[in-house]
Swiss-Prot record:
Function (record text): Responsible for synthesis of pseudouridine from uracil-55 in the psi GC loop of transfer RNAs.
Enzyme Commission no: 5.4.99.25
Protein name from the UniProt record: tRNA pseudouridine synthase B
InterPro entries found in the cross-reference section: PsdUridine_synth_cat_dom_sf, PsdUridine_synth_N, tRNA_psdUridine_synth_TruB, TruB_C
Coiled-coil segments on the chain, per record: none
SUPFAM superfamilies from the UniProt entry: Pseudouridine synthase
Stated family: Belongs to the pseudouridine synthase TruB family. Type 1 subfamily.
Record has NADP as a keyword: no
Source organism superkingdom: Bacteria
Catalysed reactions, as listed in the record: uridine(55) in tRNA = pseudouridine(55) in tRNA
Organism: Bacillus cereus (strain ATCC 10987 / NRS 248)
GO molecular function terms listed in the Swiss-Prot or TrEMBL record: RNA binding; tRNA pseudouridine(55) synthase activity
Amino acid sequence: MEGVVLLHKPKGMTSHDCIFKLRKILREKRIGHTGTLDPDVTGVLPICVGRATKIAQFLTSETKTYEGEVTLGFSTTTEDASGEVVETKHVDRVITRKEVEEVLAALTGTIEQMPPMFSAVKVNGKKLYEYARAGQEVERPVRTITIHEFVLLDEREVFEGENISFRFRVTCSKGTYVRTLAVMIGEKLGFPSHMSHLVRTASGEFVLEDCISFEEIEENVQNGTVESIFISIDEALSKFPKMVVDEKQAEKIKNGMFLKNELQITAPFITVFDKNDRCLAIYEHHPKHPGMLKPMKVLVNNQELKL
């Protein structure tokens, strides 16, 4: 049993909860997710099973797309709807569509972001949420993130009321805290705010429409069709930069052979496939030998390499 399961993560569960439940359903210990989703967030959660856990780090590095809602008028301890109210300031003016779009444009591109106190980022060996639960606030490391697209989905021309909400879609780099983006939007508009709703609609090439629920997974297990829920390792990696090697090279890859970057691929890592369209290994640029590639992960053993 191996491959990638595209789970439609339900609300109220942590990513670790999802792993624990899937281990029980599939009776498989080797399971890992490819990027944490907060309990309040639903949507795409790719989960690696069996030998596919070797490729989890590469799927984690992909860009993510979310659709969500920002509410202006009050902020919370957790920056989302689950936290306690910290500050209240009613929206005492009309906010125009143009204003919101200008704020989203200002937050597009390469920006800096400070992770929220209620997050799993570690400071001095401790997770930030551990400090937060103890009532302590510590200095947090600022991180650089990339917002590829940030668009307003709400069609209204003006927003008014004591508390106002509007919907958005954002495509961003790994490590982006979307709830912090919601707070940043409020700051630029002059009001406390929080993220009132969020769903991840895509993680790299994986989209929400292709995800399945726990109930569907259990049904496939009961029907003896569990293999149908998996995306193969080869397919999961097929969209990444790729080299194809001959049989002679394929035999040597298991021993960690270096490869020439003949295609001059500039991406941080390169998948290496054989002529039967099997992914043999994942390579990266050699730090000391320009133009050469060295293996990061070898995905096949000796027996599997016999062609």
